[in-house]
Amino acid sequence: MAQTAWKFAQTGANWTNSNNIAADDDAYATVSLGAGAYSSPLIAKNFGFTTSDVPNGATIDGIEFRVRWRRLYGYAVGVHYASMRLSWGGSDGDSKAAQVTAISNSETSFVLGGVSDKWNVSVLSTADGDDEVRSAEFGLFFRIYNADAKYSLEVGIDSVECRVSYTAPATTTTTTTTTTTTTTTTTTTTTTTTTTTTTT
């Protein structure tokens, strides 16, 4: 199994300053939500994977997303949900939901998925799986539920990264052997000289 490097999403949508997710630089994509409310989904996509990262014919083994975030306002109680975005739009596969008992007011990070987790997305198990992760539309839907029944919540996401685990395609090596035969012919020429003597 091989792994790509972590790569930042270059495109974000639906939150305030959504494209701030493209670097770990303390510039945040932000969302505010009332008590007991869901946020709109942050769409993180366009990770820039190429055939240099995931070769043609590779088998996708797992997908991971790493999110850096912090609480900007409100109390720490919340639940975050995530699902995978596919190239034809929308979301698909397992929803990754996790209870967050303390969204820190200092930046922290967490990882969704794993090296053998394909999020129950069937296309990743087909021959088109490598094309899918290289698509600019491939990515993550991420939203938050504010579990506090009284106070609003504001959250900032600094960056979203993706890493792909894969098995490289089998390679076929063809060896050509050329044999050269050299034949040497030796010709021997024998010359006979006859001398005749006449007596008178």
Q: What residue spans do the PLM features occupy?
A:
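Disulfide-rich extracellular domains of secreted proteins
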Residues: 1-171
